[in-house]
Amino acid sequence: MRFKIKKQKKFDFIHEGEGQPLVLLHGLMGGLSNFTSMVNFFSEKGFSVFVPVLPIYDLPVLNTNLTTIAKFVAKFIDEEIGKPVTIVGNSMGGHVGLILTTTRPDLVENLVLTGSSGLYERTFGDSFPRKGDKEYIKKKTEEVFFDPTIATDELVDEVFALVNDRMKGIKTVMLARSAIKHNMLNDLPNIKCPVCIIWGKQDNVTPPEVAIDMNKFIPNSDLYWIDECGHAAMMEKPEEFNEILHKWIENK
């Protein structure tokens, strides 16, 4: 299902449903479509679901870092929602959620992390990006998932176009470096809000030990595993993911 993107002066975002505000933050390589199932599910369960388009490629080069993106999300919540929200962040979106929770705790009622960066993650490494090699990009995209068929041709084409756009390629590398540099380990014990950690057991990008460490260092956190699942649980095992998260929020 294609959702209508609202285009305001400062923000482009999807907004579906009424009720408790839920803000979904996408990752570096993931667009809004990664959250299709979540938007459908939660917008019908008494939630007001927002998916802002993060300005990953729109920032000046010198400001292309996670702190700037976290400030953007804070502004979005302040101006479009105006009250504390539940943040759900996947991959880099989780990292942005962690930064936001530690810098603007007044805006975050609950934090949900899935395949979140912030401690460490495996990146494309020194070989990124091998631009012209579509097979390589296909293989790397498939590695994100437990089930490689989720890496559809459409998704591979998106990633391929991204790494072949020189400016976007540079900014992708800068954000990946910013994620590695901005390690959150010392900040985790200071997080006061409830945190739900939902992780794919077969996540190759942010391996399971990241989830175990986050659970260990974040005081008020719960950890849930999804089996036969990689780095984007809400996309790969949507029913299970939505069920776990819905129950968790209901109990808070």
Task: Spell out what each predicted region is.
Residues 89, 93, 97:
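Gly/Ala-rich beta-loop-alpha elbow adjacent to hydrolase catalytic centers
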